[in-house]
Curated annotation (Swiss-Prot):
It comes from Metarhizium robertsii (strain ARSEF 23 / ATCC MYA-3075). Secreted chitinase involved in the degradation of chitin, a component of the cell walls of fungi and exoskeletal elements of some animals (including worms and arthropods). Participates in the infection process and directly acts in the penetration process of the host cuticle. This is Endochitinase 1. The keyword rRNA-binding does not apply. Keywords: Carbohydrate metabolism, Chitin degradation, Chitin-binding, Glycoprotein, Glycosidase, Hydrolase, Polysaccharide degradation, Secreted, Signal, Virulence.
Length: 424
């Protein structure tokens, strides 16, 4: 006969499975850097991707993903967080959605992501707020206790109404020390609100809190890194966009290291940023290495680190190409073994495109493991290939599979009837 302890564990496990509860997030393993549940393999999913790109939540390789960072929610200067596209988020009816449901129900990407969570219990969803376009109001929203409280309460309200597992703040970027200090206070307010909600409605569950963070020293040197390391679960390091139309020379987009023999090709590098974050007081296990699923193009250039003239067109905006269309026909793929970065070059058109490949993704995973980092992050899902050349899948396989910490399915305080019923 099982012991009372064993019987108790069995009862708890049954309740978790029945009610959609999940085990708390484990503390980091200080030897490997990863959390006890495994490595993060996170990806940003953009709600605008459902339009021209025709990339829907069901297209996500959910079994290979630990966190979906759903982008973006907007915010007002008084701290109120709100949907910037309610049709995409909560109104769009997908083929299996009924128009005759009774009650107040949620649809759109939110419902689709919840259904993915039900089918893939290790995939967590994070509500990502801000982004490059919608960061304007962060300074005001973080400036007073009242606006910080409003931000935290409104963000957590949307999170629980939509059935998400945490909040990701994408403030690009605090401009000075005062804003950096207020950022920490804002995040602490969110942490407190998440914990208060969990204590009341999801006891034992740890809602996660992360940020998207810069890899350029001019931006991260302003941050209070040690304080961020204490309040956050993860820091998603945006180790890309090292070059572009603003650059003086064609250069790598997301290289691991500097190339002393060709510094024009490596104005920034990932390793310096990672080391600076760790020196600044961020536990290595909380740093998630961001990788691009796109390439940066340079026109009329004689090679990497050389002058260029324009960036040309792109998949959706000038100078930026989805990984899934690269390399272009006629281009040769070249590896910079010093900087650890790939690019394609067409001798005829003199177009150079710097982008990540499956091989460099494997190399980056090896790197992040050696540094004790928490895992991988990708921007953004719609640009990836399917099949064996998927960058998301390549990372997942090299990591040994994504973090197995379970998501939450039970949201008894959601304002939506079908969410409270777990879409049953």
């Amino acid at each position: 006969m099982p012991s009372l302890f064993a019987q108790s564990l069995a009862i708890i496990a049954t309740l978790q499975a029945t009610l959609g509860l999940a085990t708390p997030v484990s503390a980091p393993d200080t030897v490997t850097g990863k959390h006890a549940g495994g490595y993060v393999n996170a990806v940003y999913f953009t709600n605008w991707g459902i339009y021209g790109r025709n990339y829907q939540p069901a297209d996500l390789p959910a079994s290979q993903i630990s966190h979906v960072l759903y982008s973006f929610l907007n915010l007002s200067n008084n701290g109120t967080v709100y949907s910037g596209d309610s049709w995409a988020d909560i109104d769009k009816h997908y083929p299996n959605d009924s128009w005759n449901d009774v009650g107040n129900n949620v649809y759109g990407c939110v419902k689709q992501l919840y259904l993915l969570k039900k089918a893939n219990r290790n995939m967590k969803t994070m509500l990502s707020i801000g982004g490059w376009t919608w960061s304007t109001n962060f300074p005001a929203a973080a400036s007073t206790a009242a606006t910080r409280s409003n931000f935290a309460k409104s963000a957590v309200t949307i999170m629980k109404d939509w059935g998400f597992d945490g909040i990701d703040v994408d403030w690009e970027y605090p401009a000075d020390d005062a804003q950096a200090a207020n950022m920490v206070l804002l995040l602490q307010a969110v942490r407190d609100e998440l914990d208060a909600y969990a204590a009341k409605f999801a006891q034992g569950y740890h809602f996660q809190l992360s940020i998207a963070a810069p890899a350029g020293p001019a931006n991260y040197n302003k941050l209070h890194l040690g304080d961020l390391g204490k309040v956050l679960d993860y820091i998603n390091l945006m180790a890309y966009d090292f070059s572009g139309s603003w650059s003086n020379s064609s250069a790598h987009n997301a290289n691991l290291y500097a190339n002393p023999g060709n510094l024009n090709a490596t104005p920034f590098n990932t390793d310096d940023a990672v080391n600076d974050y760790i020196k600044g007081g961020v536990p290595a296990s909380k740093i998630v290495l961001g990788m691009p699923i796109y390439g940066k193009s340079f026109q009329k250039t004689n090679g990497i680190g050389k002058p260029f003239s324009g960036v040309g067109d792109g998949s959706w905006e000038n100078g930026i190409w989805d990984y899934k269309v690269l390399p272009k026909a006629g281009a040769t793929v070249i590896y910079d073994d010093v900087a650890k970065g790939y690019y394609s070059y067409d001798n005829r058109t003199q177009e150079l495109i710097s982008y990540d490949t499956p091989d460099i993704t494997k190399e980056k995973v090896t790197y992040l493991k050696s540094k004790g980092l928490g895992g991988s992050m990708f921007w953004e899902a719609s640009a990836d290939r399917q099949g064996p050349d998927s960058l998301i899948g390549t990372s997942s396989n090299k990591l040994g599979g994504p973090d197995t910490t379970e998501n939450l399915l039970n949201y008894p305080d959601s304002k939506y009837d079908n969410m409270r019923k777990q879409m049953a």
